[in-house]
Amino acid sequence: MKVLAPLVLASAASAHTIFSSLEVNGVNQGLGEGVRVPTYNGPIEDVTSASIACNGSPNTVASTSKVITVQAGTNVTAIWRYMLSTTGDSPADVMDSSHKGPTIAYLKKVDNAATASGVGNGWFKIQQDGMDSSGVWGTERVINGKGRHSIKIPECIAPGQYLLRAEMIALHAASNYPGAQFYMECAQLNVVGGTGAKTPSTVSFPGAYSGSDPGVKISIYWPPVTSYTVPGPSVFTC
């Protein structure tokens, strides 16, 4: 495994991904419609950068005026594709299979989802899928599941506008920091029907992750990984 790792890294060096569209009630809202997509599919590697919130420099991110209405308590699906021009949904159309790591989703309540930068405090985690007991990673489930990343919008949050930050972290080069590859985009939501019964604790981006976190700096090749701690806070529950 130690011998093969450099070959894996070299072959996967340019294999990236983008959260390109959002599906609500079985309807895809359209490429870049209500999702801030970059023109390039490369990762963010600096967890202290403002770009760790909703992507950004060195990537150019397009704005969108659409705010997608979502019913609290329902599931939405982030659709991941290798490039904006990718039309298929085979594993290779999503992300290289070497890109093993967690899938994560956060929400942040904002006054205006179309203009809020996402940088700073207010984020709370609503989904995570790390490595299961059989050694299969969250990214593998998305890659082999046609790029579909299912996320439940909690029923107990207050109604209003939110940013939805969907993320996949690739750990194939994470034995040193920087090395982990963070892929994230933000969707713009108007959440309706929430009860507001609970107020989540929040974290900041940048700030929620550290380069020394065990879920950020880790060798997934050798020694064999037997457990994995997803970075960031615990998942908010109602």
UniProtKB/Swiss-Prot annotation:
Keywords: Carbohydrate metabolism, Cellulose degradation, Copper, Disulfide bond, Glycoprotein, Metal-binding, Monooxygenase, Oxidoreductase, Polysaccharide degradation, Secreted, Signal. It is an enzyme of class 1 (oxidoreductase). Disulfide bonds join 54-186, 156-238. O2 binds at residues 45, 172, 181. Residues 1-15 form the signal peptide. Glycans are attached at residue 75. Binds 1 Cu(2+) ion per subunit. InterPro entries: AA9, AA9_LPMO. It catalyses: [(1->4)-beta-D-glucosyl]n+m + reduced acceptor + O2 = 4-dehydro-beta-D-glucosyl-[(1->4)-beta-D-glucosyl]n-1 + [(1->4)-beta-D-glucosyl]m + acceptor + H2O. Cu(2+) binds at residues 16, 99, 183. It comes from the Eukaryota. Catalyzes the oxidative cleavage of glycosidic bonds in cellulosic substrates via a copper-dependent mechanism. In the presence of an exogenous reductant ascorbic acid, degrades phosphoric acid swollen cellulose (PASC) to cello-oligosaccharides and 4-ketoaldoses, the end products oxidized at the non-reducing end. Somewhat active toward tamarind xyloglucan and konjac glucomannan, with improved activity with glucomannan in the presence of PASC. H(2)O(2) is able to substitute for O(2) in reactions with PASC, xyloglucan and glucomannan. Very weak activity on cellopentaose. CDD domains: LPMO_AA9. Its cofactor is Cu(2+). The keyword Thylakoid does not apply. Belongs to the polysaccharide monooxygenase AA9 family. This is Lytic polysaccharide monooxygenase NCU01050. One of its GO terms (cellular component) is extracellular region. GO terms for biological process: cellulose catabolic process; polysaccharide catabolic process. Pathway: Glycan metabolism; cellulose degradation. N-linked glycans containing mannose and N-acetylglucosamine. Its main location: secreted.
